[in-house]
Amino acid sequence: MKSVKRWYVSSLVAFVALLVVSACGRYFATPLQPATEQAAGMTVNDDGSITYDLDRLAITLRPMTDEEMNRLASPSGDESVNPYTFGDLVKPGETWTETRFPVFRLQVANYQFPKVRIDPVSSQISAGNHRVYAPLSFSDLYDYYRAHWLGRTGQGRVEFRDRTDMLNRTLFADDFIFSGSDADGFVVFPRLDDDVRQIQVSLRDIAVRFDYTDEPVESIDLTFEFDRDILRGKTPADAVRDN
């Protein structure tokens, strides 16, 4: 009877240990990709972007990877001061670099209306599990990096200026996009939670017609849908899909 009890206890301990081991591990998200189903008027492109066409107005949204952002937005090739990523920073004891923000490239080609205006601050991410994320404005990111200064002088100040200068040049601006012209820039959101697999990126109140005081009298709302998988493991290399 004692041997049976010992076997039961040892089996229970082993089972609990197995549960703990299987439950351990970190979550790693795969890059966002366009969902199969999109709203009317949307076209999924080979580069992973989605384009909405309204006659000769084209609005394209594309999720960016950290590798792409490091190539596009690293001053003088120095990834350590990239405002959109952690650059080449690897935490002690780890072999990979975490993602800092979800970043989308927004491109507009206006050959249809006298002028168009998109305010990126009016955008929003809605997740399939009902989480909602508001965009990060220049002011939000300015305060974020100011709070991360190592010091108010010296190298910390130089890196802060490099980052904010890059943000000022590359964030999508809410300027008028006049007929025959294009606009290009990034829209940034807070890091998505680990349980988020499907998202809708909404561009709201896109103004396409204005009155004589430049107040919008006609606007449209667009929704771009993206998916990603969530992997679990100790490192990105050994992570598997988490069902």
Task: State what each model feature region is.
Residues 24-243:
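Conserved functional micro-motifs across diverse proteins
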